[in-house]
Amino acid sequence: LIRKLTKNDYRVTVVTRNIHQKSYIIKTQANAGYIDIVEANIFDEEKIRSLFEKADICINLIGILYEQKKGNTFRNIHTVFPSILAKLCKEYNLKHFIHLSALGINDAVDSDYAKSKLEGENKIFKNFPLATILRPSIVYSVEDNFSTSFMTLLSRLPLFPLYYNGKTRFAPIACSDLTDIIHHVISKNIYSKIIECVGPEIITFKEILQKLLKLIDKKRILLPFPLPLAELSARFFEILPKPLLTRDQLRL
C-alpha cells in the first residue's frame, strides 16, 4: 500500500508501535521524502491527534485475530480505536477515512470478533458518515502470516484437523488487489460505502490446505474433527503466544 500511494505522489505517515522492529522494512517501500515513520501507542490520543493536523486522509489497517493482555481486546482494537479515528477525522475535517474491516461479520452473531468489527463500523459511520469501509476476505501475499503459519504446521504434523469438515468457504484476495482497491477509493472519491473485497476464486478450507501441501511437496492426513473436539483443540491453541485457532474463530 505504501508503494502504491507514494508512486502516485502521496506522502505517507506510517504509525507503528515498534519503530525499531519495522522501520527498515517500511523505509524500503518508498523514496526518501515520501514517507515518515512515527512510533506511537494507538491509545495515546494526544500523539494520534497531532498526526491529524497535517493529514488529508486516514487509513486504518489495524486489527487482531485473537485477544491478548495489555488492552489488546477485540472491543478496544476494532470498536474503540476506529471510533476515536472517526471523531478525529470529523474534528480536523479530513477528506476521507478508509477503514479495513472483515468479510462475513453480519452473519457471525456468536463471535466476539465479528461483533466488535460490526460495532466499530457503526460507530465510524455515526462519527464520520463519509467513511468508506472495506470488508476483505482472507488476504494473501508473499510470506503472509496465514499461509506461512499453516505451511509450517503442515510440514511438522503428520495429520491436520479439519474443522467443519473443511467445508468453510473463502474467497482469498491478493494483497496487491486490495491495495489497488484502496487507491481506487481514494482517487475516485468513493464515500459512505461498505465494499466487500474478494478474489476471483471461491475455495474451501480443505482445498486451501491441499494447495499448501502441494507447495511444500508434502503428504498429510487431513482429519475431520467433530465440533466438541475442535473446541477442545482450540482451548489448547489458545495457550500459545500466537494461537492458530481460538474458540471465537470457530464461531465465525
Label every model-predicted segment.
Residues R11-T13, I64-L65, N72-N127, A131-S137:
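Conserved Rossmann-fold NAD(P)-dependent oxidoreductase catalytic core, especially the SDR/UDP-sugar
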Residues V185-D248:
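Mid/C-terminal beta-alpha module of Rossmann-like enzyme folds, strongest
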